[in-house]
């Protein structure tokens, strides 16, 4: 339990920041899930559209410190590869 005033304030700030970060992380997961669902359905156009929406969300999460920048880059890279592979298989 925080005893000093500054420690109590720090606890309040941490709680607020935790709530914001949870919301951001949830938002990122939603966008990534939409891309994965579009890939699973086999719709290349929908997958590309979802990927283009997810990419800035991942970048924003990385810039805000919710995700490590390497983690965000890895997720973007892997999703891009899957979307590209899907578009190649549907056109060929």
UniProtKB/Swiss-Prot annotation:
Signal sequence, start to end: none
Molecular function per GO: small ribosomal subunit rRNA binding; structural constituent of ribosome
User: Which domain of life does the protein's organism represent?
Assistant: Bacteria
The record's annotation in InterPro entries points to: Ribosomal_bS20, Ribosomal_bS20_sf
Q: Which GO terms describe its biological process?
A: translation
The terms describing its cellular component in GO are: cytosol; small ribosomal subunit
Protein's UniProt keywords contain Ribonucleoprotein? yes
UniProt entry keywords in alphabetical sequence: Ribonucleoprotein, Ribosomal protein, RNA-binding, rRNA-binding
Q: Does the keyword Glycoprotein apply?
A: no
Region (Disordered), start-end ranges: 1-23
As for family, the record states: Belongs to the bacterial ribosomal protein bS20 family.
Known NCBIfam families for this protein?
S20 (TIGR00029)
PANTHER family per record:
30S RIBOSOMAL PROTEIN S20 (PTHR33398), SMALL RIBOSOMAL SUBUNIT PROTEIN BS20C (PTHR33398:SF1)
Q: What does this protein do?
A: Binds directly to 16S ribosomal RNA.
Q: What is this protein called?
A: Small ribosomal subunit protein bS20
Q: Can you name the source organism? A: Rhizobium johnstonii (strain DSM 114642 / LMG 32736 / 3841)
